[in-house]
Structures are given as C-alpha cells and as structure tokens.
Amino acid sequence: MKHWKKMAASLIAISTMVAVVPTTYAMESEDSQPQTTDTATVQTTKAAEPTLLASWDFTGKNGTTNSAIADSTGKYNLTLKDGAKIEQYGDRSNNEALSLRGDGQYAQIDDQLFKDAGDSFTLEFASKTRHDDSGKFFSFIVGKDGSNDANTTDQANANKYLMFYNSKTAIKGVISNNNWGNEQGSKVTVSGNDNSWADYKIVVDGTNLAVFRNNALIIFKANTGIKMSDLGATTAYIGKSFYSVDEYWNGAMDDIKVYRGADLTMPTAVAISGTGVVNNKLTLIEKDSTKLTATVTPDDAVSKNVTWSSSDESVAKVAADGTVTGVKAGTATITATTELGGVKAELPVTVEPMNAQNAAAADLDAAIAALKVPAAENLPLVAKGTKNGSAITWKSSDEKLITSTNEKYENRTTGADDPYRGAGIINRPAYGDGDSKPVTLTATASYNGGEKVTKTIEVTVKEKTRIAPDTGYAAVTFESDSNGGEKAWVASTEKNDFFTFKTRNNGQAVLTNDADTGGLRDMFVLRSHEGDKYYLIATDLKVSSMGWSQNQVNGSRKVEVYESTDMMNWTRTNGDGNGGITINTPNAGMTWAPEAYWDDDLNAYVVFFSSRMFTDDTRTTPVKNDKTGNSSYAQVRYAITRDFVNFTEPQMWQDTGYSRIDSTVRKIGGYYYRFTKNEQGGAAGDYITTGKSIFLERSKVLTAPTTEASPGQDPNTGWQLLEQALLPFEGPETIKLNKDDELNTKDDDGYILLSDNFAYRAFMTTGAELSKTTWDNPMTKRYPDFNNEKKPVKAEPGAQGYITQGANGGLPDKVRHGAFVNVPESVLKVTKSWTAANPTHIEAVDSTTKAVYNAGTRELTATVTSADKGTLAGSVKFSAGDWSKTVKLDAEGKATVTLPASVSGTVAVAYDGYTDGLVNPSDTTVDGIEQGKVDLAELNKQIAAAEALKESDYTADSWAKLAAALKTAKAALAAENQGEVDTAAADLKTAIEALQKAPTNPGEGDGDKGDGNKPTTPTTGDKTNVNKPGSALSNTGTAVLGLGGAVVALAIAGISLTLWRKRRA
C-alpha cells in the first residue's frame, strides 16, 4: 500500500510488560532503593501484508454513465446509477473520477467485495465534497439496508452499517448495528475541505475503527463492539444513504482501493511522568493536584490516547486529562491504559493529611468570595466548604435581614437536603425604604473536627425592586441545526395577546455564544425570584460544527448562563469573557436542555439538565441499561444555586433506565407539574408506551428522585405519572396567561402549553384542568382532540386544545426549542426598540399626581400613579408660600398632610420620583384653600382639668411634668395650626393621667413614687380656678415638711432595727 507504513496489526499476551512505573514499587519505603527492572520485551507478530482485492482509478472512463465499471482485477463491478458519471477534474491534473451531483445519483459496489474483505480490511480513496454539513447524507456506506430506519427498538430490521461522511466542514466515520442509536466512532471538524481533494484511509481491524485524512489520524474508536460480520450484509453505496429521507451526496471520489487485512501500528509501551513524580512515585497533600503525562511508544502508534484510573478514588482521583488530586490520607495506584491494546503503566501515590487550619481557612475564603454583595437574592451560605469540605456555620448580626445557620437542621427524608441549612435567606426592606444597614456575617469552619477558624463579612441587603403588572410576553428561541442557526433570537408580542409574537432586532439574533462550542440552543428564561432580573440558561451546543455524537461525549460540557433586566442586554452571570459554567461531573458526556425552577423548600433555584453518563472521567464507556437494549441513555440530573454562578454538585433526578430529556416544571397549587420528553423511540416502561412524546408527572417535592414512571407513585414523596403522550415530540414549555390577556379566564387561570414539533405548537388549557389530570382521568380522555394538530380549537377563554393563529400560529418565526416569559410594559418597550446598532434600555415611566383636599379636617391627600400601574416609592412635597412639608409615599402611593390654619390660596403638590429613576416626576396644585379656624374646645377643657388640681396632692416629679404640659397648652391657645392645638391638648391629658398621688402618711413609702392613685378631675359645672393661672401654684413648704417627716421616720426605724439585731447576737 502506497504512503502507509506497514506495522504490526495486533499485540498478544503483553501482561508481562512493565512500564516505566512498575507496580512492585507501590509499597516501597522512602529509604529503600528503587528496584532495577528491565522493560519487558514486547513480542509482536507481524500480520500478513494487506492484500489488494480491488481498485478503480477510472482512467479512460470519462463520460461513462449509468453502467458498470470493472475493477483492476476484473472480479468486482462498480455500477453507476441514476445519472452518476465519470468526469475529468482539472484540479486533479485532469484525472477521471467518479462524479456525484446529488439529485439521486450514486454508485453501487458489488456485495461480494466486502464479503471477501471480511472483518479486517483497508479502504483507500481520494475525495472532494461540495456538500454542506447538513448531517443528512452518507458519502460511503456498506452493510445491511434494513426495512426499519425510523426507530431503534426494532433492531432486527434496523440499518446496520459502516459509514463515511464528508462535508465542507466535517468528517464522520462510524459503525452501527442499530440505526443511529449505536453509532460507534465520531464526527470531527476539518478546515480547507470545501471542494478540495484529500486522501482518505478507512481501516477496520475487528472491532477497531480508524479514519485517516492526508496521512493524519482524525478518527479512532477502539472496541466498538461491532464487527463487519455483525452487520448481516455487505450492500455498498457511494453517495447514497440507507435512510430513505436522506439526501444524495454531492462530491467526487477517485483511486478507490480495497485491501483484505488491516494496517494499524499498535502501542508497545507507556510511561508516566509529571511534576512531583520522583523515583516512580508521587506524594501529594490532601486536596493538592498535579498533572500527569502518559508517553506512548512507538511514535507512529495509531492511537496515543490513554485512559486514567485510580485504584481508590476515595484516596486519589484522576481526571481524564491526567490531573490527579489527593482526596484523603492513604495510598492508591494511578494507572494509564492505552486506548488501543490495553498497554498499562502504574504510579503509586501517597496522600498525606492536610493541615486542618489551612483547610478550613481555604474553605472560608472560597465561601466568602462567592457572595455577591449587596445582596438582592438569597445568599449561598454553604454548610460544607467547596474546596476541602469543612463544616461551616454562619451567624448573622440581624436575623430579620439575613438568617443564620439552623443548628437544629435535620436532613429531609425525600428530595435534596438544604446545602445552606437554613442560612442566607434575606428579607429585603420594602421598596422605598432604602437598603439595609450593614449586617455582619460571622462564618466559622472546622476541617475534620480540627481547629475552628472564623472570618466575617459585612453585607448590605438591597431594598425590594419596583414591580409592575405583566402586559406582554417575550420568547427566546434558536433557528436551526445549520451553521448560523444556533444563536438566541428574541421575539415579543405586539400587545397583551399571547398570539402576536414578532421577532425583534430586525430579525437578527440578539445573543451569540462567544466561547466554548460557539453554539446556543434550548434556551430557558426565568424571572428571578425577587423580580429584579431575568436569567437565561442555554445548552452549549453547535451541531453544525461537531455533530451529534461528539457533542454527547466531548462537547456540551458547560452551560451558558446570562442575566438581564430587560431581555435584550445580556451579560454573563460569571462575568463577560469567562465562557460557560461547568455544573456537571467529569463522567457526564453532555449537559443538554438546562432549565431551572424555584424550590420553595430550599429557598433556592434547582437547575436540571439531561446527561449521558459514562463509567469514568475518560468518557469512553457509557453507562448502559438492559432496558434499552444495553445501550447508553440520557438521564436527568439537577444542581442547586442561588446566584447562577455557584452550583452544588449535581445529583440524579430522573433515571428510569430509559432516555429522558427536556423537562420543564410549573407549580400549580401545592404540586409541581413536570413535563418531560420520552427520548426513546418506543416504550419507556410499562406505562409510557409512546416514543418521542411528552408525558406529565406531579410531586410536592421538586427534587424527589425518579427511578420508575408509574401512576402508583406517592406524589407526597415522589413523582406520580399522570398522563403519557400529552404533547407531541419535544421541548415542552408552559406559561401562565397575563391577568388582562383577553384569552385568560375570569378567575385568572389560563395557561399555554407549548411543544417543539420541528416548530412550536401551542395548546390552551387552565390550571384547574391540569390539576384534574390523573392516569385514570387524563386530559386526552376529557378532551380527545386536545393534542390533535389537525383539529385546532378557537382561541378563547377556557379553550382546551391546539391553537393556530395566523403565521407560525402567532408564535415566533425562529421556531426551535426555547422559552417564553411574561414581561411588564417597560421591558416590552425595550424589546421593540432595541437593535444591535442602537441598544436601548428601560426608560422611566410617566406618573400622574392627583390631590384631594378635605376642608373639614384640612387634610390634603396626594395620590401618585404610574402609567404601567407599578409600585411607587419616594415622597411628595406640599408647599405654599414659606410653608412646606415633605411626606413619604405609603404602599398605595399616597401621602397626606394636615395644612396649618395659616395656609390659604394655592398649595403645590409635587412627586419627585425615586432614586432608581424608574418613574418620572409629576405634580399638581390645589386652589381655593381658605385660612383655617382653630378649635380650642378640647384644649380649654384639658387646661381647666389641670388647673382644678392641687400640687400638694401629687409627687414632685409627676407634678413638674404636668406644669410643663400646662405651660405648652396655654401657649397653644394662640396657635393657628389645629394640629398644634390638638397635640398640646393630648399631651396635657396624658400628663394629667400620669400624675402620681403623694403619700398621706409620712411613714408610707417613697414620696417620689406616690401611691399610684389617679387624680380626681373636677365635676361638671365646677368652674373653680378655671383660666386663673396663679391658682394652680401650691405652698411648697407643705411638700418639704412631708418629705422631712418621712426621712425622720426612716432614721428611727433604722436605729430600732440595729438594737434588735444586737440583742439577738
């Protein structure tokens, strides 16, 4: 074979081989000398030289079409079909080549060729492609063209094939024994492939598959589990797919050669090195990490990939990239195993204990650094350190503003335990009251019961935000799988009518992923629990560049998370420029269709997503289940967050052994309702029998795990299956209709359910109808055509079923899986005006101030309203001439003042807005105010009552307070302000009631305290001393005499007590 080095095809019995790190060193002491061990001699057997079976170079065949062309041996034919022909190519020195232009053109190779090639063969050819990366064609395929290409449940009749795919931007090579469901291999992105020739080689060696491009290995899959003989047939096409709906390839192929036998150079040895590796050993401190490198020989081995493993992950764990981390004190062995051949090297690792104080301090530093201040959301006051796992407790200086750790917290019997143990729940001051005073949080950490470390941080709690009624809707969707279609488009309604969506930003995308895979799909948007902002969380996925298979293993490892106050101006929650956030574990191959919902029990958000799990961090062997034909499947996991920056470790949420994806949640009454797609092509257990459709469950515990789909589940502790196949296909979403949407019900119970059936479909219902749904009383029993797209119902309050309203059903024209959210008028306006060239922001809404004057009470009440009917904060200033008074608005937007009697004419009433600038000022005036008359009746009554009393009857202190109040009251007789008069009367009355009687017997008690009796007020008609100020003054000598007598009596009593005690002694 030209251009390819002939090397050994396999290794046999290499268990005696010793790599640079022998296992015999694992328990060697530090004082001992390392053993000298010769590297084991690797015995290799040179495979028989690959034998040429057939070749076509098409020389002299220019113009041939619709006929058979024999190979160089004359034994096998390549037959041109439906317009396929041989053409000369100037970019290939005018060589003739097989030319396929789509439109049904293809070539077929005799079945016998690949039957003769057997389980190990090599295919070489030159090729160019003119085909976009649509994912819907095959360039070359050999195997069984089955009668079932619609699902993966009927494996006996499924397509089974070895396939090569050549597009302008990607190459794919896979082998499968069950349609797309078990494709083994991968798809890779390549450059310079558009209409350009390249040399390719496909090598199949038993269950090993390799694809080379221009002599470079681009795809390799060891141990596919599928041999060519497992495919059941050897039908071979160039340019035609086994799938009836696929396209025909647009490309060319030349110099086709098929050999019996494989030509793969196998690894012969592997050695481990890295920082800290000394004498073939590694020592780490707990929580420390170091990067290991595996060197595979020979240099031209077909695969130098290795998988890493640990003999004890509780002591030392190792990531897929070779980073080893000490977990706890002890010993373990790290092993590197070649992907091909299973050649191993082992490295003994000793993990020494960490210093408890340093460990605790590191955990505290990380926990405090994670806090976003000032606080507008509950704080992630973790009970367990994220670095080292220290136990952390938090103490708040003001429990009314921020809660402390609940030291009596007990783990829940079902669902997630609170990772914050009651700490960090904030109580924001009311809108208009301003931010809180600083609260001191004291965090105390202890690592493994060691020395406690304490640190503090001051946190200000922000006042509540302004809230306005929702008067429209917004949506965020993506367009398609094609290049340029995996971005976020924003649409919004023209008015408060759900079926009036229009794509904004002149039809262009609003948000593009500038990091990671570069794609955004399956967006979900929710308003924050406190209402300040919107969060957007999306799948990091670009099918157009990486394909589906690779993205389920090595792509889609993060989620892209953004926040915005107006749905158009988005920033990353973790800071622009930082890319996505990894919330999944290293052994999870994808993080798809993320959504979130508020958990009332955890006081936090629960973020859930689908993942295909693997047995270890290398993500080479998927977790399989015999329920699905022993194939991998998608599970749904969740993590908890309070800020969409810091997430807890993910936990299993839904693992029934069958593929699930696209869960969305809505709480109605006391239940969470969960809509999820059955990703299986058919049944998923005993109850869900319809594949690729959406089923409904409910539970009172959002994070309760699901291991079985059953109507018999207790919804108090798990998820109860209510209905299968409620909605078609995938991407379910729900939204509650706005209160004033004309399609809403009178009791404000209208809902829209949506599903992505290759474009969004809308179904109307109510919360009451969803709540009625049970397995025995499903929605489709009560409304048989509920999900029948051929029988739409009229859009009206209380409608039940499929709605179609004009173009796209009145829904966004960017039709793929996204999210829908209610928005107030201020946000709706931004969505309509915003463009990338001229990004707008929320503008202040107008306000109106009205004032009503009550001449009888002289009260002037101002009422401020906003154009969007939202909440208000700030103050109203009342002014006339030299007089003014500023009064804070109450919760209803009102402020009241009592006008002084001297104020007359016109009073100005002005609302100045608030510090957040969200509402414009407004003002008004009140004319015709007449000067007030002061009513002195009550004041004179209280003065008369006070002057009727005798000072000698009361204690000195209480009488002094009365005298002061009386003086103020008499001064108020000349006041022009009724309020001043009323206050003086009230204060005088209070002083009278507070008088304390003087003791009548000098030996009784303390004269300053009196006997506690209340004074007797004059009877009606007694005018003595009324309005005679001098008559209220008493003879102070009387009071002094009474006090002196009390002192003498006390002295005598003291002497008597002393003499009595002496006698007793």
From Swiss-Prot:
It is an enzyme of class 3 (hydrolase). It is found in: Cell membrane. GO terms for molecular function: alpha-L-arabinofuranosidase activity. Residues 997-1031 are annotated as: Disordered. Keywords: Carbohydrate metabolism, Cell membrane, Glycosidase, Hydrolase, Membrane, Signal, Transmembrane, Transmembrane helix. It catalyses: Hydrolysis of terminal non-reducing alpha-L-arabinofuranoside residues in alpha-L-arabinosides. It is a single-pass membrane protein. Optimum pH is 5.5 with larch arabinogalactan as substrate. The chain crosses the membrane at residues 1040-1060. Residues 1-26 form the signal peptide. The keyword Magnesium does not apply. Its main location: membrane. InterPro entries: aBig_2 (IPR046780), Big_2 (IPR003343), ConA-like_dom_sf (IPR013320), Glyco_hydro_beta-prop_sf (IPR023296), Invasin/intimin_cell_adhesion (IPR008964). Residues 1014-1031 have a biased composition (Polar residues). SUPFAM superfamilies: Arabinanase/levansucrase/invertase, Concanavalin A-like lectins/glucanases, Invasin/intimin cell-adhesion fragments. It comes from the Bacteria. Optimum temperature is 50 degrees Celsius with larch arabinogalactan as substrate. Belongs to the glycosyl hydrolase 43 family. Involved in the type II arabinogalactan (AG) side chains degradation. Releases arabinofuranose (Araf) from alpha-1,3-Araf-substituted beta-1,6-galactooligosaccharides. Can use radish root AGP, larch AG and arabinan. Shows weaker activity with gum arabic and arabinoxylan. This is Alpha-L-arabinofuranosidase. It comes from Bifidobacterium longum subsp. longum (strain ATCC 15707 / DSM 20219 / JCM 1217 / NCTC 11818 / E194b).
